[in-house]
Amino acid sequence: MALRACGLIIFRRCLIPKVDNNAIEFLLLQASDGIHHWTPPKGHVEPGEDDLETALRETQEEAGIEAGQLTIIEGFKRELNYVARNKPKTVIYWLAEVKDYDVEIRLSHEHQAYRWLGLEEACQLAQFKEMKAALQEGHQFLCSIEA
């Protein structure tokens, strides 16, 4: 049976869009262990917890962002399936916008750094193709609902 985890692809809208019109920035966290990969906050589902509760709890634990500081974007949910440490893993992601552009990020011991990045930079740091695809799909979804 696959390990199950859930998380939020957190973004903010730039106050002044950059020249390349990259008005959306994604939050990525750098893991403290292993290959120090960059991902949005995520974690394993606890017994009795539903998937979205897990995503919100993990975001609070890993980045210090509480549920009340976020707006979950309706209509976007992605399931990533891959192998991690020789075991199948499923990760469910939702899109969430921070309500405050300057929200304080407080990292847990599981992460050593964070960055707000435009789509292209975020995809360069996200080493796994499934994660890159989820970021691209999230960006495309956000652009489609703004139009």
Curated annotation (Swiss-Prot):
The UniProt keywords, alphabetically, are:
Acetylation, Disease variant, GTP-binding, Hydrolase, Intellectual disability, Neuropathy, Nucleotide-binding
Query: Domain named Nudix hydrolase: which ranges?
Result: 1-139
What GO biological process, any one, is recorded here?
Answer: AMP biosynthetic process
Alphabetized InterPro entries for the sequence:
NUDIX_hydrolase-like_dom_sf (IPR015797), NUDIX_hydrolase_CS (IPR020084), NUDIX_hydrolase_dom (IPR000086), Nudix_hydrolase_domain (IPR051325), Tetra_PHTase (IPR003565)
> Pfam families under this entry?
NUDIX
Give this protein's Gene Ontology molecular function annotations.
bis(5'-nucleosyl)-tetraphosphatase (asymmetrical) activity; bis(5'-nucleosyl)-tetraphosphatase (symmetrical) activity; GTP binding
Residue(s) carrying N-acetylalanine: 2
Identify the residue span(s) of motif Nudix box: 43-64
Task: Tell me which EC number(s) this protein carries.
Answer: 3.6.1.17
> From which residue to which does the signal peptide run?
none
User: How is its cofactor bound, per UniProt?
Assistant: Divalent metal ions.
Q: Which residues cross the membrane?
A: none
* Reaction equations catalysed: P(1),P(4)-bis(5'-guanosyl) tetraphosphate + H2O = GMP + GTP + 2 H(+); a 5'-end CoA-ribonucleoside in mRNA + H2O = a 5'-end phospho-adenosine-phospho-ribonucleoside in mRNA + (R)-4'-phosphopantetheine + 2 H(+); a 5'-end FAD-phospho-ribonucleoside in mRNA + H2O = a 5'-end phospho-adenosine-phospho-ribonucleoside in mRNA + FMN + 2 H(+)
Q: Which cofactor does it need?
A: a divalent metal cation
Q: What does this protein do?
A: Catalyzes the asymmetric hydrolysis of diadenosine 5',5'''-P1,P4-tetraphosphate (Ap4A) to yield AMP and ATP. Exhibits decapping activity towards FAD-capped RNAs and dpCoA-capped RNAs in vitro.
**Family as reported in the entry's similarity comment:** Belongs to the Nudix hydrolase family.
What is this protein's name?
A: Bis(5'-nucleosyl)-tetraphosphatase [asymmetrical]
The source organism is Homo sapiens
